[in-house]
């Protein structure tokens, strides 16, 4: 007899799934909104994954999450490139886009300040991203605060502060303002090729000096040290440019997906909690043999298999999930206590105490007192139920993480 699954309503929660030093794109980014994503499919897909979780069908849930991430990946993201005039912002944008300065679509560059209004650019290397080339600071008497207001910093998702030759007070002010807005930002030191060609210091020492100078200036104003990249816009394959690209791709995924998937995880957590509550009630009030479809409700190993099946974390399902996510099954099983009863008992001291030799002997002696035996049996089952539910949450969190950043095999 196969155990039945209960349907429960779920409300979104916001667990601590992905801590960062910076606030997410939105602290209240509801998963099922379509105005952000431009897709009316998301509410439907969200409901289908919730239904799959209630029914213990994790593979169906994985398919839904993948569709969700694919849709979220199309959300437009705005990146502001800013800094002092003459720091090479336009040249950097061209290098980031892997485009020559003389091409028609390139950002104008030159000795004279060419960028007088903010200009947007796109790149096939960063789909659905708008790179904004902002006018440089310092060319007018305009304050940094007025500049921030005029350039509409509040509309930006991620900032790249360009510096060269020196890390000025304007750079520090920009960093402090952006940090106060809770936005992600990088500092990119350009023209490194020129620094290396004119410096008497070794390359290693010069790079250390630049980074230490940036850190010291930020610390004076209590600004948290952001990602810093030392590059040459003349060669986007050297120095920190590859690292910058990789970091940017990851942060774009975080900006688009982190908050919606945190909300979705909260919904999943609620569904798992509701299922636990339903089964606790059944354990307390119903025959365990009938509820679980087992012959011996004291056979903890067999009962554990049933609980894993109820939540969809049985061996076959976990194997299918791992294959679908493009990784080995041990990536998921390594974090599971409930792989088998021996492992579960070893990992959980409460269950180990409930099933130790002394308790088992006591259990056998009190066979003639059904109420006492029944109470102990139910305690064991509730503990197993709780542990399987915890494993389910861990697997769900890993699925969501891996859907944003696929594991490297």
UniProtKB/Swiss-Prot annotation:
Phosphoserine: residues carrying this PTM: 202
Explain the induction of this protein. Answer: Up-regulated by LPS and IFNG (at protein level). Up-regulated upon infection by various pathogens including T.cruzi, T.gondii, L.monocytogenes, M.tuberculosis and murine cytomegalovirus.
GO CC terms for this protein?
autolysosome; autophagosome; autophagosome membrane; cell projection; endoplasmic reticulum; Golgi membrane; late endosome; late endosome membrane
Q: Report the PTM annotation.
A: Palmitoylated on C-terminal Cys residues. Palmitoylation, together with the alpha-K amphipathic helix, which binds phosphatidylinositol, mediate binding to membranes.
Q: Which family does it belong to?
A: Belongs to the TRAFAC class dynamin-like GTPase superfamily. IRG family.
Functional description taken from the UniProt entry: Immunity-related GTPase that plays important roles in innate immunity and inflammatory response. Acts as a dynamin-like protein that binds to intracellular membranes and promotes remodeling and trafficking of those membranes. Required for clearance of acute protozoan and bacterial infections by interacting with autophagy and lysosome regulatory proteins, thereby promoting the fusion of phagosomes with lysosomes for efficient degradation of cargo including microbes. Regulates selective autophagy, including xenophagy and mitophagy, both directly and indirectly.
Name under which the protein is recorded: Immunity-related GTPase family M protein 1
Organism lineage reads as: Eukaryota, Metazoa, Chordata, Craniata, Vertebrata
């Amino acid at each position: 007899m196969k155990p039945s699954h209960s349907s429960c309503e779920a409300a979104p929660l916001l667990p601590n799934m992905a801590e960062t030093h910076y606030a997410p794109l939105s602290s209240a980014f509801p998963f099922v909104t379509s105005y952000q994503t431009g897709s009316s499919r998301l509410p439907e897909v969200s409901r289908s994954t919730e239904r799959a979780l209630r029914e213990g069908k994790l593979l169906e849930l994985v398919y839904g999450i993948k569709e969700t991430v694919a849709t979220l990946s199309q959300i437009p993201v705005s990146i502001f490139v800013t800094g002092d005039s003459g720091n090479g912002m336009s040249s950097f944008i061209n290098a980031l886009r892997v485009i020559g300065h003389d091409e028609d679509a390139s950002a104008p560059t030159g000795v004279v300040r060419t960028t007088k209004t903010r200009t947007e650019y796109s790149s096939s290397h960063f789909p659905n991203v708008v790179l904004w080339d902002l006018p440089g600071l310092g060319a007018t008497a305009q304050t940094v605060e007025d500049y921030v207001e005029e350039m509409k910093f509040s509309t930006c998702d991620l900032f790249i502060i360009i510096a060269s030759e020196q890390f000025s007070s304007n750079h520090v002010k920009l960093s402090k303002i952006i940090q106060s807005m809770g936005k992600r930002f990088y500092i990119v030191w350009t023209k490194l090729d020129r620094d290396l060609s004119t410096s008497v210091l070794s390359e290693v020492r010069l790079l250390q000096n630049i980074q230490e100078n940036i850190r010291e200036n930020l610390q004076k104003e209590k600004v948290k040290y952001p990602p810093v990249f030392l590059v040459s816009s003349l060669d986007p394959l050297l120095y920190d440019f590859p690292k910058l690209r990789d970091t940017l791709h990851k942060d774009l995924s975080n900006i688009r997906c982190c908050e919606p998937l945190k909300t979705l995880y909260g919904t999943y957590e609620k569904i798992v909690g509701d299922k636990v509550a339903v089964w606790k009630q059944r354990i307390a009030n119903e025959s365990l043999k009938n509820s679980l479809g087992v012959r011996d409700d004291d056979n903890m190993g067999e009962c554990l298999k049933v609980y894993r099946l109820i939540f969809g974390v049985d061996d076959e399902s976990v194997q299918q999930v791992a294959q679908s996510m493009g990784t080995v099954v041990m990536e998921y099983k390594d974090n599971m206590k409930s792989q088998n009863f021996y492992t579960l008992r070893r990992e959980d001291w409460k269950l180990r105490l409930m099933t130790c030799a002394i308790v088992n002997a006591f259990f056998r002696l009190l066979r003639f007192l059904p109420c006492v035996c029944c109470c102990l049996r139910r305690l064991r089952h509730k503990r197993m139920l709780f542990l399987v539910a915890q494993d389910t949450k861990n697997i769900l969190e890993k699925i969501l993480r891996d859907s944003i950043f696929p594991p490297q095999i």
